[in-house]
Every structure is written in C-alpha cells, then in structure tokens.
Curated annotation (Swiss-Prot):
It comes from Sulfurisphaera tokodaii (strain DSM 16993 / JCM 10545 / NBRC 100140 / 7) (Sulfolobus tokodaii). The record marks 124, 170 as: Important for catalysis. This is 3-isopropylmalate dehydrogenase. The lineage of its organism: Archaea, Thermoproteota, Thermoprotei, Sulfolobales, Sulfolobaceae. One of its GO terms (cellular component) is cytoplasm. Pathway: Amino-acid biosynthesis; L-leucine biosynthesis; L-leucine from 3-methyl-2-oxobutanoate: step 3/4. It catalyses: (2R,3S)-3-isopropylmalate + NAD(+) = 4-methyl-2-oxopentanoate + CO2 + NADH.
Length: 337
C-alpha cells in the first residue's frame, strides 16, 4: 500500500530542517522500497504574507487528496494552520511520546511515557465571549462520545506497551464535565489494563517526582497540552519531542517545538523532533497497511537517531553540542546503512 504525503516546510527553522531532512526520507524510501510520494504545499506565515491566508485554498486541495500531512514548525499563524486542519479532518487524538534519548543526561533516568490527549473539545473548542465590560466567559465542552473515543485510542496504545493507563482529570472540582470524562474512561479501560485515575495537579507533581510510574496517560485537551510539555522536558528536551494528530481519515505529524526565528538561517536548528515525527508517521503507515516495510523503516530511523545521540559526535547547540544541522543530518544519514 502506497501513501501520498502533503509536506509543509513551515516557518523559521522549518524550511531548513525539512529541506535538509529530505535526503533521509529519500534514502529510507530507497532502502525499504517504500511507495511514498511527498508533495510540498505552502502553509504558515510565509503563505499568509504571499496569499493572505495561512492555509491557502490550493494547499487545502492537495492536503485533501493526500493520505497524511507532515509539517515543520509554523510561526505566528500556527493556530490558523494546525488547529484548522485538526477541525477540518477531525484529528481527535494528539499523541505525544515523552521518551529519553541516549546521550541526553537528565536527572530522571529512563523515561518512557505516552500522553494521549483529546484534541477536539474542552476549553480549546473556542466557545468564549464577552458577557459585559470586564467579564469574559469560556465554555468547557466534554461529550461522552469524544471521551470514550480517546479512551479507546489510549487502550490500543497501552496494549502494545506496558498495559497501564492513568486517566487524568479534575472531577473533584469540575464534577459534571470532568466527571463525565472520567466515567467514560472507566467504562472503556477498567478491567482491560492496569487502570488508575489521578487529579491533574497530582499528575503534574508526580511527573516531576516519579515519571517512571506512568505508562500511558489519557486526558482532556487543556490538561494534555500542559502535561505533555512538562513530560517532554522531563524526558530530555521539549525541542526534540515529536507529535501526531490522528483521526479516522487523516493524520498529521509535526515537531512539538516552535519556529525558532532567532536561529533561522544559521544552520544550527535541530531536525530531531521532525525526524522522530517521521518515524511516528511510518508507524501509522504500518497500522494502516500492515506492511512490515513501514515498521522496519520507523525502527531504523529511530535507532539511527539514538546511535548518533549516544555517540554525541554531531549534536546541535540546543542539546549541548556544537555541530550544524548538516552535521547531524549527515550522521543520521550514514547510520541508516
């Protein structure tokens, strides 16, 4: 089974890390005979300046026909690109791994957590308005359908990992909305994996105190946004964290970090988060096709990255090295065989 990928370079360091990473994508296609076609589309700040839209209609036409979206970091127009794409294609699951990389020292030891965040509801639904002068109201939307749906995603991941799920909420205060989310998680998860619940403030503290206690965390949109950034930093660095936005018909893969305009054009941007997002993309392709070539490609790319970090010979300044983007890309490329 082949795939068409809409490739968005993004802004800031995005065009550098994406364009320089293309040779790795091409090599993996060749090594594993992957039938993947990449089609570049414009989106983000540069598209906004050129066309008056961060997500131009012509780009949307290409994205609509593509199977998967792969993007670099987008600048100030990120909400007009990523949030809009999530809404258009109902990409309801935000998957954020927080996994230690060999060669990056942290005081937390080996961390391997997967945060499964509901991506379409909660306060981020955007239902807010001014009631009167000096008074604003935001509506928190939680439905049983979306809550059960994200719990099922968490279950599927947990069954392939350590079979442990923590549902994170704040039902002791938000008894109705968070209570509904917790009830939905219980109905899907209890009895099928090692299941527990934790209030979000306790989860934030326990991530710092003992991150090894977590395997898969299933949570709401706002809590997941905050906890996933915290977990990524605990695992080593927010700057090397990948992510996926997954729906039934479309998926988007992107680095967690921003566009880093301050280092754009200096050839020191770190492509690791983008490349780990590519590894996640191959994993998704395997799930959709059941073609072993994709999972082999995913593991090979991840292993190549880990080998380079373990040797610490070509790391960029953000992770304690003095190498360039090109240096790191070259080392990963060579490790692929």
């Amino acid at each position: 089974m082949g795939f068409t990928v809409a490739l968005i370079q993004g802004d800031g360091i995005g065009p550098e890390i994406v364009s320089k990473s293309k040779r790795i994508l091409a090599k993996i296609n060749e090594l594993y005979s992957l039938p993947i076609e990449y089609i570049e589309v414009e989106a983000g700040d540069r598209a906004l300046a050129r066309y008056g839209e961060a997500l131009p209609k012509d780009s949307l036409k290409i994205i609509d026909k593509a199977d998967i979206i792969l993007k670099g970091p987008v600048g100030e127009s990120a909400a007009d690109v990523v949030v809009k794409l999530r809404q258009i294609y109902d990409m309801y699951a935000n998957i954020r791994p927080a996994k230690s990389i060999p060669g990056i020292d942290t005081k937390y030891g080996n961390v391997d957590i997967l945060i499964v965040r509901e991506n379409t509801e909660d306060l981020y639904k955007g239902f807010e308005h001014i009631v009167s002068d000096g008074v604003a109201v935001g509506m928190k939307i939680i439905t049983r359908f979306a809550s059960e749906r994200i719990a099922k995603v968490g279950l599927n991941f947990a069954l392939r990992r350590r079979k442990k799920v923590t549902c994170v909420h704040k039902a002791n205060v938000m008894r109705i909305t968070d209570g509904l989310f917790a009830e939905a998680c219980r109905s899907v998860l209890k009895g099928k994996v090692e299941y527990s619940e934790m209030y979000v403030d306790a989860a934030a503290a326990n991530l710092v105190r003992n991150p090894q206690m977590f395997d898969v965390i299933v949570t709401e949109n706002v809590y997941g946004d905050i906890l996933s950034d915290e977990a990524s930093q605990i695992a080593g660095s927010l700057g090397i964290a990948p992510s996926a936005n997954i729906g039934d018909k479309k998926a988007l893969f992107e680095p967690v970090h921003g566009a880093a305009f301050d280092i754009a054009g200096k050839n020191i941007g770190n492509p690791t988060a983008f490349l780990l997002s590519v590894s996640m993309m191959y994993e998704r392709m395997y799930e959709l096709s059941n073609d072993d070539r994709y999972i082999k490609a995913s593991r090979a790319l991840e292993n190549a990255i880990y080998l380079v970090y373990k040797e610490r010979k070509a790391l960029t300044p953000d992770v304690g090295g003095n190498a360039t983007t090109d240096d790191l890309i070259n080392e990963i490329y060579n490790k692929l065989g």
